[in-house]
Amino acid sequence: MRSFRSLHLLLLAASAITADAVPAGSSITPPPPVEPVSLLSSHSNPQRPWTRLRNWVIESIWGIPKSQTSRPTAHDYSAPLQGSTRYGSDVVLRFRVQGLDEAEALTEATNILFLDVWASTTEFVDIRLAKEVIPSLLGLLPDSLQTAYVPLIDNLPEAISATYPARRSLGLNDQFMPSPSTRAPDLFFEDYQPLSVITPWMQLMASMFSSHARMINVGVSYEGRQIPALRLGRSSQPGESRPMILIVGGNHAREWISTSTVAYIAYNLMTRYGSSAAVTSLLQDYDWVLVPTVNPDGYVYTWDSDRLWRKNRQPTSFRFCPGIDLDRSWSFEWDGNQTQTNPCSENYAGEEPFEGVEAQQLAEWALNETEHNNARFVGFLDFHSYAQQILYPYTYSCSSVPPTLESLEELGLGLAKVIRLTTHEIYDVTSACEGVVIPASGDKSAKSLFPVGGSSGGSGLDWFYHQLRTRYAYQIKLRDRGSYGFLLPSEYIVPTGTEAFNAVLKLGQFLTEQDYPGIRNIDWESEYQVGDETPTQESTAFTDESHEEEGKDVTVDTDDEDDDYYDRWEPLKWEDQRPLGFRRRR
């Protein structure tokens, strides 16, 4: 309690001190730049009183001694001991699936053996299982699949352990002398962070950039934890109806990179306000709400007990199998009672729509914003991992075509292009239903598609697009393509975040050019962050021979003559809803 009071007082002090240090202007012309928090920067000139107090606040919260010149010791969040026991003999295999018969056989076999399907795309299915179960799985598969697999991860406990921050010793040979440009991301985004660090960090950022950021909660989890979010924006007319973009991560607890990525996006939006014309414009024209983890209970559980836990932590009808898949718990086209009724399944959707507490809480918050605060959702980004895909509605069915399909595809291709120009990583763009299916007979051009892992009704993506008529709604599956899966090393946090932040800027550009045509004079190309990676550096993509072949099928053109394609947009109008979707006005 005492430490909580101390933290609270420190944050209040930081908020009061920095209130006069943030830009006060509301015009599109950027006000004086807001300096981001610098945890280890040196000063050649005497510090002003508020600067000294600000640094004291940060030192007190982060535990950085004033005289320390080496990199601070990370928190000791070593891998749980249960990991080596629970996953001692587990491996991850990738199966190449061709045709409906193989897809159905693999789906049935994984259901019979209660296996954990890590990813399923039009090209492959990744499955985690114990080595001693491999013969049983192969015995249930047709001959064509008996040899159609390769190992992705052959030592799962070691891979799990590597994702936790390691305790670092600060010996004389390990000193790190920071440059004056050393900033908070060098520390916070150096490792994955537990919720006990993320929440105070969000509070600190909100207090430091209080002119355009504030901490909110969008709900309460089953175990009673707040679901924290950062709300960013600066309106010249308080209380006016403003378009809103919602960015969420951490629906599935084990997808740590999604949580870090949302935090990275929030950080860059906050710190670049005032110095970036694009970010300043976006925060003055739109409200942004960023939720690093929708599933705080599950996220905490991955740190304390089981790194690969996926669902939330609420009880089910089977006491030994808690948890509901929050991304199958939404009400639109919910089909959990038809597809997956086993509480032990990783995809268990509950016994009724919105049984997943956190999904229900987020939906209530969104509805309250639209009904009582005049909010209009115009963008929704739901970050997941892994597979490097940009998915648009609908998830529940490939036979239902979204009414704004052309616009969704156009912007989706634009997002993929920006990412590729940033770090040279390829993100596929497709319907969310195709993200979990394979074409009939292995023919990618075929129109008849069959699910690998069952229906995916009840997704948040479909709900925001259909129920709230969010114009641009995407589920983005981040890195990688299988080399590490859910266990992406921490050195990829910043490159992945850079990709995602540039994609967010592209979304903002798309919206701005639609909503303010010819008004906002912004050089968007100069605003994108430059990725640290080059084509010659190690890629996170799986590089077996068959995977290299699939890269040839990417349809996003990079020719300069086609650049203007990504900037064109033809508005489509909405009409009354039908039971299964919208009609597009001709």
Curated annotation (Swiss-Prot):
Disulfide bonds join 321-344. Residues 191-511 form the Peptidase M14 domain. SUPFAM superfamilies: Zn-dependent exopeptidases. Keywords: Cell wall biogenesis/degradation, Disulfide bond, Glycoprotein, Metal-binding, Secreted, Signal, Vacuole, Zinc. The keyword Hydrolase does not apply. Residues 22-167 form a propeptide. Residues 1-21 form the signal peptide. Binds 1 zinc ion per subunit. GO terms for molecular function: zinc ion binding. Substrate binds at residues 252-255, 310, 327-328, 385-386. Its main location: other. Residues 534-543 have a biased composition (Polar residues). It is found in: Vacuole; Secreted. GO terms for cellular component: extracellular space; vacuole. Zn(2+) binds at residues 252, 255, 384. Residues 529-564 are annotated as: Disordered. Belongs to the peptidase M14 family. Inactive carboxypeptidase that may play a role in cell wall organization and biogenesis. This is Inactive metallocarboxypeptidase ecm14. It comes from Emericella nidulans (strain FGSC A4 / ATCC 38163 / CBS 112.46 / NRRL 194 / M139) (Aspergillus nidulans). The lineage of its organism: Eukaryota, Fungi, Dikarya, Ascomycota, Pezizomycotina. The gene is ecm14.
